[in-house]
Amino acid sequence: MEEKTHHHHHSTNKHIPSSKSRTPLLHKPYHHHVQTNPPPFLLHPSSHQNLNLVASNLPSSYYYYYYCYFYSQFHNSLPPPPPPHLLPLSPPLPPLLPLPPPHSMTRFHKSLPVSQVVERKQQHQQKKKIQVSNNKVSGSIAIEEAALVVAKRPDFGGQDGSVIYLLANHFLVKFDSSQRIYHYNVEISPQPSKEIARMIKQKLVETDRNSFSGVVPAFDGRQNIYSPVEFQGDRLEFFVNLPIPSCKAVMNYGDLREKQPQKKIEKLFRVNMKLVSKFDGKEQRKEGEDWAPLPPEYIHALDVILRENPMEKCTSIGRSFYSSSMGGSKEIGGGAVGLRGFFQSLRHTQQGLALNMDLSITAFHESIGVIAYLQKRLEFLTDLPRNKGRELSLEEKREVEKALKNIRVFVCHRETVQRYRVYGLTEEITENIWFPDREGKYLRLMSYFKDHYGYEIQFKNLPCLQISRARPCYLPMELCMICEGQKFLGKLSDDQAAKIMKMGCQKPNERKAIIDKVMTGSVGPSSGNQTREFNLEVSREMTLLKGRILQPPKLKLDRPRNLKESKVFKGTRIERWALMSIGGSSDQKSTIPKFINELTQKCEHLGVFLSKNTLSSTFFEPSHILNNISLLESKLKEIQRAASNNLQLIICVMEKKHKGYGDLKRISETRIGVVTQCCLYPNITKLSSQFVSNLALKINAKIGGSMTELYNSIPSHIPRLLRPDEPVIFMGADVTHPHPFDDCSPSVAAVVGSINWPEANRYVSRMRSQTHRQEIIQDLDLMVKELLDDFYKAVKKLPNRIIFFRDGVSETQFKKVLQEELQSIKTACSKFQDYNPSITFAVVQKRHHTRLFRCDPDHENIPPGTVVDTVITHPKEFDFYLCSHLGVKGTSRPTHYHILWDENEFTSDELQRLVYNLCYTFVRCTKPISIVPPAYYAHLAAYRGRLYIERSSESNGGSMNPSSVSRVGPPKTIPLPKLSDNVKNLMFYC
């Protein structure tokens, strides 16, 4: 039986020499007989078909390799070179027998005492990275910034599970690292749009080829040009006279009546180019390192080169490209169209540089007149052409400004190449607007357009568009058109989002075919001249790799796939509840008694007690109550008083989705202190069994119950690290930000923490508002401290380990998040005497574009439990892709887990098993979800906080003065309303 090893932070083994790296010395370059780390045959055993091993030489090479490994771990040095007859002719291990992970040696060689030395040494090396200051400054712990290194992979990948062969949408990029690249800075005046800038570059290449040494350079459309050869001079200046198509059309109340013949206006541009740097891609390793990424500037240059061809032919939005030539363009309503495109990104992987290519769908503004656009976008303006004299109320004006702000338009009353950005609306209606001319004489805007352009403005009572941030500059709405190629701003409606989702909901074989077509098509990254000129070769075949399918855990539920005969593991008792009907026809309202009966029966069947009678008769309210906050609050208080201020639940049946939903939640959870469950009349009228079951499960989860539990507790799955008597807390964190172009609303951070062990399926949450678009969680130390307090109250112990899952962090923010948020967690722990738990900090990424496809021809999604941690993952750091859910529609998207810090020293198998098992513990579902529950709960809680903020700010209104477009000073952070004590420890956000 293995000896228990307690992983305390202060544990050290002074007789073991320290090392600069956790990487075994054997894997560092050493003369001629040791492989560099990671040995490619260990990472990609299936890819080596020509091992050329001599049978007689295999055993000696094999055992010498293990001898080197244990010698290096015990002596902290390498053994002397072996005799010549023991030198391996090729990789010394058989292709399917990888080296055991370092700190799991006890499972393979229990008789070797060196295994304990290896484990303790690695524990010491990992934990010494944090230096705890004895002098507490401002209540925080000092963490040496230089010591914070992102966790390295602890082994060569997991071994558990059955093998599955997969294709990944990563395409290998081969390049000549000695190829020199010349970087030039470009300045164009007057400053053009991206489209015009590319036209300028194209004309220069055609007319002045000698200046560019006969090559076609790559241009990012802004200020950077990359060339495979040096131009004729370090500084170049050109003057380009470019004929630019003008925009003019005759308007008929917002619709194009006829398009004028397109004319071209000559415009002169000055182009200055300056050589900034020249570099190549040779690896720049630091002394003692066996791997280093390519220089960032080289990666950026390669990325621009590979984007050159699609940028010439498509509209680029971020890292994605869209074109109507790809098909799939579809109106989605509300003045928007869905457009199909593709995403591409260059990534460092274990197999080398790879191009991640995927299908992308997004919404664009429809290129129509502003009046026609508003008719489609805003329901209250559908009759605008028939009611030209209509004025806007203050609320309607606010909605119009919200719909148009930051959209680019062009005018249709004159020839022009100019585009304008909408910054707001005028205070006055068009009829009342006057403006000064160059001589200071005031002119009436309507008279000006009639005298100069012969156009009589029709919509006199609408405001004008304000098209300058700094000074008054107005355009009548009816004379403006929406420019093409603009991504839809703001939040899509539920109907629009559903249509976009449907456009992107391709079966795996369909998605794969689209990606393959892009790679071989004319808009693909390898179809232009740049790849040839820069000596690049992009594979047109997806990456073949081996994944593994993990075994699902057994649950404490008889039939997890059939709710008809199953009961929840923990059912709650709901004795005091009420029902509130908001809106609805008389026929819909008549279904309420049947709905109550069906719901109570279903709850009883599931093991949830819901009293068959509400505390009072149903409260029927008109739908406009959701528009009146004070009236809504008064009614909710009345319902609470009817229950003697002891209500557990209010079920709210609504006629349709309404923005007042946010007010209902905020008032109920912060002012009244009661959990609510909302549903729609169309659903309760149909009253399907599945709908009622899901509703009952949500209610049970919110009031304190849970659907299921792991049959074998979490510690039993990882006995090396976890024990029932040493509790562990699982935490999740997320930050939500305002919609694009909202430049003042605060961001909302949420942190959740488990409060039971070893079940670990009940969570409490904490939410805070913070600085506008601040990704780092500012009050993390306070929230973690509160969650640890809650854990202690529930479990009577502080957790020995903290497993922290952080959602919503991009790769560029990894080090900053690790540095600041790990410090915050440590600071929270320091508030407790002699408390120093082991911490694992993992980032959870769902918004990525890696997709995995089966190799077999059945075209189904990959099965739940599919994990990949080789070939397409990071070359050195600890990450893996896990598809934990069953993909029913579209193509499954695996979740990417990247471990930034690991004092618990998980092996790949252990952490993957833990995450997969946790995905079965979601509180209101019997099937595994796609993302680890703590991260998902944090996302839901942050969204709830965002709802509070948005409704509060909308209720307070805003200034319509165009001068307010230029905000002075930093935006104020609106504090979140405090949760009621009755609600804050419940999972009300589920």
UniProtKB/Swiss-Prot annotation:
Region (Disordered): 1-25, 953-973
Polar residues bias (residue ranges): 954-966
Pfam family, one: PAZ
Record keywords: Plant defense, Repressor, Ribonucleoprotein, RNA-binding, RNA-mediated gene silencing, Transcription, Transcription regulation, Translation regulation
Biased amino acid composition, Basic residues: 1-13
An MF annotation (GO) of this entry: RNA binding
Gene Ontology cellular-component terms listed: cytoplasm; cytoplasmic ribonucleoprotein granule; ribonucleoprotein complex
GO biological process, one term: regulation of development, heterochronic
Record-annotated PAZ domain positions: 379-484
Ranges where the Piwi domain occurs: 649-950
Organ and tissue specificity: Expressed in leaves and floral buds, and at low levels in roots.
Disruption phenotype: First leaves are elongated and curl downward. Increased number of hydathodes per leaf. Accelerated appearance of abaxial trichomes. Presence of stigmatic tissue in the middle of the septum at the apical end of the carpels.
Stored InterPro entries: ArgoL1, ArgoL2, Argonaute_N, PAZ_dom, PAZ_dom_sf, Piwi, Piwi_ago-like, RNaseH-like_sf
Family: Belongs to the argonaute family. Ago subfamily.
Function description: Involved in RNA-mediated post-transcriptional gene silencing (PTGS). Main component of the RNA-induced silencing complex (RISC) that binds to a short guide RNA such as a microRNA (miRNA) or small interfering RNA (siRNA). RISC uses the mature miRNA or siRNA as a guide for slicer-directed cleavage of homologous mRNAs to repress gene expression. Required for the processing of 21 nucleotide trans-acting siRNAs (ta-siRNAs) derived from TAS3a transcripts. Associates preferentially with the microRNA (miRNA) miR390 which guides the cleavage of TAS3 precursor RNA.
Protein name: Protein argonaute 7
Organism: Arabidopsis thaliana (Mouse-ear cress)
Lineage: Eukaryota, Viridiplantae, Streptophyta, Embryophyta, Tracheophyta
